[in-house]
């Protein structure tokens, strides 16, 4: 598999499947050890959404009259919620200024910024949504992850942002990095994101290759 130039993570997934099959056959002694992968030191620049790029996506959505999409981008990026948690952003939650998110038997409270609440309430009134979910389709059903993904991708060309950077989860990554720059508290960020492990949160904070190169340059050790 290495000769086929597969990524180490991909190889480990395949090995795990083979190992499960070997156990099923009653041959556990023939299991293969997975590759040891060093934790990444930096993220791929081609997938890192920057703040200016996010703002261009927002502006493009507004220019095209796609108010719902613009608000969706702001809601995900401004609170750090998962795309699957958008359904918890209800009229009632906006009036309270917080959303109660239930996931895996746990309830997490997400504070909704005042400015965002005012925008959401204005949109809800305009759409005549008196209660329940705010982000609805024309059939008054909750908007799906697939639709959000597709609508975001449709902004890429006009916004001048690479499609590889434009997907809902990247908004959550941008929130995490921006939040950490302000508070410098990874434990607090983990709570906000709903992570049970700080190690998961650390993945969100990995710098890009460009940022890492800048750090090395600032060391001043190359004369």
Language-model segment annotations:
Residues 1-17, 65-67, 142-146, 165-167:
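N-terminal core-binding DNA-recognition domain of tyrosine site-specific recombinases/integrases
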Residues 28-56, 101-105, 138-141:
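Flexible interdomain linker/hinge and immediately adjacent N-terminus
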Residues 48, 104, 193, 198-218:
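Catalytic-site neighborhood detector that most strongly recognizes the C-terminal catalytic loop/helix
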Residues 74, 78, 172-196, 210:
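C-terminal catalytic core of tyrosine-transesterase DNA break-rejoin enzymes
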Residues 79, 84, 88-122:
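Conserved tyrosine-mediated DNA breakage-rejoining catalytic core shared by Y-recombinases
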Residues 104-122, 132-153:
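C-terminal catalytic core of Y-nucleophile DNA break-rejoin enzymes
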